[in-house]
Amino acid sequence: MTDLSCLYPSLLCTEAAKTSYDEDTTSVSSGLSPPGSPVDLQNSLDHVKRPMNAFMVWSRGQRRKMAQDNPKMHNSEISKRLGAEWKQLSEQEKRPFIDEAKRLRALHMKEHPDYKYRPRRKPKSSNLKQQPRLNIAMPTIPPQSLFNYSTAFDSLKTHDLSQYYSSFFQSPVLSGSTYAPYNMMAAYARQAAAVAAASQVSASTTPTAPAT
């Protein structure tokens, strides 16, 4: 290993990059299946990992250092802080990591010429379809309570308008105590129409005096 690293120093960098990349992605892939299970072993053999980009090359050392300094900090919070620090770097400061990412990408294409990125989709949980619907029962009101509620609306009834309409007609047709105001209005309207029709009939039957 020492002779090969002296002859090919890039080989040592590549192996170190792969090792660091595996350590960074362990927390993400470990939640899919228990470690050491046959499913996890088969996925690790079949799945080809993406090459690291410039940010991943830069953050692999920064992430480890920040995790050591803040052991209680969540991984998502570390990623947010690293992303903010990466944006503040100048293009000149990012250049070495961009070049390293290009080299790793070219090496990845050489080792896996048929590679095509296929993101893993989360399985759709069928729990949403199987959730029972909420059955909310409407409150039931006994019939006797309905009659008790009706007395509360007695004060909202309209006033007796029979005296008002009686001033326009000689004899009241209906009594306001037994009929609703709208029925009284209809009755008075029918009486007015009958009086108008009778006056038209009497006018048409009255003879006119001959002209001299």
Curated annotation (Swiss-Prot):
It is found in: Nucleus. One of its GO terms (cellular component) is nucleus. Gene3D superfamilies: High mobility group box domain (1.10.30.10). Pfam families: HMG_box. GO terms for biological process: brain development; negative regulation of transcription by RNA polymerase II; neuron differentiation; positive regulation of transcription by RNA polymerase II. Disruption phenotype: Expression of immunoglobulin superfamily adhesion molecules rig-5 and lad-2 is abolished in the dorsal and ventral SAA neurons, while expression of the neuropeptide flp-7 gene is lost in the dorsal SAA subtype but remains unaffected in the ventral SAA subtype. No effect on the number of rab-3 expressing neurons on a sox-2 mutant background. It comes from the Eukaryota. Residues 48-116 bind DNA. GO terms for molecular function: DNA-binding transcription activator activity, RNA polymerase II-specific; RNA polymerase II cis-regulatory region sequence-specific DNA binding; sequence-specific DNA binding. Keywords: DNA-binding, Nucleus, Transcription, Transcription regulation. PANTHER family: SOX TRANSCRIPTION FACTOR, TRANSCRIPTION FACTOR SOX-3. Probable transcription factor. Involved in the terminal differentiation of some neuronal cell types. Dispensable for neuronal fate commitment during embryogenesis. This is Transcription factor sox-3. It comes from Caenorhabditis elegans.
